[in-house]
Amino acid sequence: MDRIYLDNAATTAVSQPVMEAMLPYYMQVYGNPSSIHSTGRDAKKAVERARRQVASALGCSAQEIYFTAGGSESDNWVLKGAAFAHQEKGKHIITTQIEHHAILHTCQWLEAQGWQVTYLPVDADGFVTAQQVENALRTDTVLVSVMAANNEIGTLEPVAEIGALCHERGVLFHTDAVQAVGAIPLDVEALHADMLSLSAHKFHGPKGIGALYIRKGVKIDPLIHGGAQERGHRAGTENLPGIVGLGKAIELAEEGLAENAARMTFLRNRLISGLTAAIPNMRINGTMDKRLPNNVNVSFAGIEGEAVLLRLDLEGIAASSGSACTAGSLDPSHVLTAIGLTRDEAKGSLRLTLGTDTTQADIDEVVKKLPGIVASLREMTSWCGRG
């Protein structure tokens, strides 16, 4: 049977044009970009072309783009690099309670090294406000980090407003845009971002490659030491095929952004409407207003989300119960508990994230099969609980 893949927030398939762009850089143009011979120079040209493609998508200079191994490295680099580079000013950082663990765990590591971190709460839809940030700012605050879009519930944070506030107050502002790039329009100038993280595998590029935008003039210490790659900011021989794939993927994502967003918004709303009509006691997590166009997150009273996942998988449907980075954890989602769900409600959650290949037939098949799965599991739970 044809499988239906609705876990695109975890990762996406490499598109055919991206794969075709990458292939020559495995066996034909395979030189080290730091080498001065022609094969190395050809590799260097490919790296710089990809850098321009990323810069074009973000509205910045190519010299402000640095390639990394992905979103987690970019987030680690921002927090540790900015913290150590600006510790003479202070050791206070502001973030939110619903950030990706690449942010939260790095902040916890910094706390163990003597930094202080304020974790802002969010409302029932997952929003933080610029006013909250302003209230938390101190004279020793060196960095504010707020994600552009939440990876679990799809909430689009008011990052432009927060960025403007940070600039006005002379505090560095970073946004983790891993889920947002390729899904919504982004411009670093409009966002007032000093730094921005992204990862190729979230928009049909390869895994293991990402980038960090660092505004010209912003001081940040390196995370990885060694050679002089990435203008001395990030050591290590460049992942040439990956960089080429990232460049092509972000170029294609930007070209089809408006069309894909409109189509996925329609399909997302169709999915939510269908499930709402067919499944009683189902909660939609997050807002319907300012939400990623491909994100659906729901909770079912009385059953475990993991059980729903297993049954869906048997039916040929791939989904998730939250962030792929926390799969296997016995703890409920920190995002869902932060927006007010109980542990049981959070454990009964299901995340369905659409992709560019998702069809209306896929959505209708999920609406057809999921209500029966939920009803069956609820019946089993009720039977097992009888005294």
Q: What positions do the PLM features span?
A:
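Pyridoxal 5′-phosphate
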Residues: M1-G387
